[in-house]
Amino acid sequence: MRDLKTYLSVAPVLSTLWFGALAGLLIEINRFFPDALTFPFFSF
């Protein structure tokens, strides 16, 4: 039961950090490539 409580307290923190980092990455990509449907570094 203690392991379950530890998991339930760690998972929201990790997911908040992960989604915050992902949102920051998307914001920075949109800052350098605004309104891009295709990114120049993905086109071959």
Curated annotation (Swiss-Prot):
<keyword id="KW-0602">Photosynthesis</keyword>
<keyword id="KW-0472">Membrane</keyword>
<dbReference type="Pfam" id="PF01701">
    <property type="entry name" value="PSI_PsaJ"/>
</dbReference>
<dbReference type="GO" id="GO:0015979">
    <property type="term" value="P:photosynthesis"/>
</dbReference>
<comment type="function">
    <text>May help in the organization of the PsaE and PsaF subunits.</text>
</comment>
<dbReference type="GO" id="GO:0009522">
    <property type="term" value="C:photosystem I"/>
</dbReference>
<keyword id="KW-0793">Thylakoid</keyword>
<keyword id="KW-0812">Transmembrane</keyword>
<dbReference type="GO" id="GO:0009535">
    <property type="term" value="C:chloroplast thylakoid membrane"/>
</dbReference>
<keyword id="KW-0934">Plastid</keyword>
<keyword id="KW-0603">Photosystem I</keyword>
<keyword id="KW-1133">Transmembrane helix</keyword>
<feature type="transmembrane region" description="Helical">
    <location>
        <begin position="7"/>
        <end position="27"/>
    </location>
</feature>
<protein>
    <recommendedName>
        <fullName>Photosystem I reaction center subunit IX</fullName>
    </recommendedName>
</protein>
<comment type="similarity">
    <text>Belongs to the PsaJ family.</text>
</comment>
<dbReference type="InterPro" id="IPR002615">
    <property type="entry name" value="PSI_PsaJ"/>
</dbReference>
<keyword id="KW-0150">Chloroplast</keyword>
<dbReference type="InterPro" id="IPR036062">
    <property type="entry name" value="PSI_PsaJ_sf"/>
</dbReference>
